[in-house]
Amino acid sequence: MLPKATVKRIMKQHTDFNISAEAVDELCNMLEEIIKITTEVAEQNARKEGRKTIKARDIKQCDDERLKRKIMELSERTDKMPILIKEMLNVITSEL
């Protein structure tokens, strides 16, 4: 579980809008999914090199396109998602 207060603080650094508890919960869920996917890909990278330790380079080597597709799937999973979260996900994918 990601600390909701930290996620909300980060969100507030990027907007003057009010942020509902539901929006924070939804973004926390999405970020946890992104962490899960990234970890799985990093594990595969480490395994290919015969290691049992995930290193920073394994994270850096994660397939940007795979992550981008998953983030877009998450952002499209509901029409009820607050626009702010959709915009934040768009920013994340544009940085990949």
From Swiss-Prot:
Family: Belongs to the archaeal histone HMF family.
Pfam family, one: CBFD_NFYB_HMF
Assembly behavior: Homodimer. Dimers then assemble into higher oligomers, with the DNA wrapped around the protein core.
Protein known as: DNA-binding protein HmvA
NCBIfam families with a match to the protein in the record: archaea_histone (NF043032)
Chain segments annotated as coiled-coil in the UniProt record: none
UniProt source species: Methanocaldococcus jannaschii (strain ATCC 43067 / DSM 2661 / JAL-1 / JCM 10045 / NBRC 100440)
Gene (UniProt): hmvA
Primary site of residence: cytoplasm
